[in-house]
């Protein structure tokens, strides 16, 4: 059913010249600033920056794969948290780079913006950070050793903190069939706040890279435990398999993934898509394997093609009556999972980050290829076209009903203060940066929360009914749910296309539920809603989870609060169990006003957990929320079994 073109020369147009020598390496500037301002080059010195070092080296190997010269990449985490990345590409050039007067290998690892990615014939398309990778990793590592197999010889070179410690040396021979690069490095603990690599973080990124690079095999090895841990990612179906993976836990509306591939305007385009029974669209866009979370011209081209092609087909085949309006793009994309991947020789991005593609030719290329091939697909698969049309029409009706409900909500809150939920105990301050709102479950916690708060800056909104599971609901049901409607109105931002962060009434939104399984379920329902309809609240750091204590230990008229069984045991050891009076809180309602204020609400003494998300995490987060809140039981059971060891609160 998938549309595939047997065009053997298509990828070859994007493969680089086999000439990959010193003269393909171009030098733009020096390396001095990296150790002084590492955040400028890798984003941060947190755990995120630590993992970014691995991606930089891996991306260089992936560039070899995109150029058609690499089939295998192995990433190894060693016991000391050093990393080895090994590939079977052509091997970094080792001959003299004329302009620098030193070996190309040394240039690659000691000069910023050096690489075969700047107009030479070394690479046609490239991800990474335009050649920044290897030198930045070197600058931020205690040591870095590189081994190159090339032209029948084995070369090594060593560095420390960006400086050469051992000159390039030929240490032996290899067969002509052996070729590639091996980089072994240890991140500098003086630079990074965290020095421990997380297997799962690397796994997610490497799996995504393998999906986007058809037939590339990436192996991840962890040597830190007694039992070696290994995972291999290899997808012959490429982004088609990516879509199937993302739709795991959802019910696909038709069996096969729709696939479009072609080349136009010297741009290689791949699109894979499939509708499922959910009500949200999940579209992920990539340029040269780099995620573009803000979309850009390639996304615009796809949306234009999908909307026009589908409406044209529906009209021609009488799936839409003449009297009915066209289906909107949003209606057609409801429940759509889609990957858009383009390969461009010199992509232009908007702004300083690679978040949004600006290359105008990409819109023309994607729109043309998707229009032509999707038209052919719909004509060949009328049953699938009908299923897509029926879902889109249902979405259109639900959107119309939601619009009426939304307009009603807007009218109610048109005047400042008017239309706020009646159950909201608001704060008196109008300075949003100072204000926070506690979302509490039930009336039992409402009394102590209202009495224990600071009424100037702390608001309280109780949830009296069951929060809707938005993972299984259309917009019209969402606007009809009183609890969700109350949150939308109280927060002030609106949702979806109406969302406006500048109208946020409280800079801290604190979910305060009981420290038990039911409380965790309510928190998850609320996070599912915020993630799907107000994700910027999470991205900008406005959403928190309150951390109420589990135990109150009293001895000699002094109170000690424990937030876990482990902390409880430690406190008893410290103060002595004899004469200690211990009470376990079953819920927020069991605390008196002073206890709740001191342990959970007072900014001076409470503990909050900030909810974080990064754009790069979106695909995995979508899968997690679908697993936890979707219809299918088996993926949820597997998730619980896998993560049971992390559970802190267990009702027995």
Question: Model-derived features: where do they sit?
Answer:
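GHKL-family ATPase ATP-binding module
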Residues: 1-24, 31, 55, 63-65, ...
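Residues immediately C-terminal
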Residues: 63-64, 91-92, 517-518
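Short conserved segment of the HATPase_c
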Residues: 92-115
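Conserved P-loop NTPase nucleotide-binding/switch module
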Residues: 97-102, 154-155, 159-160, 601
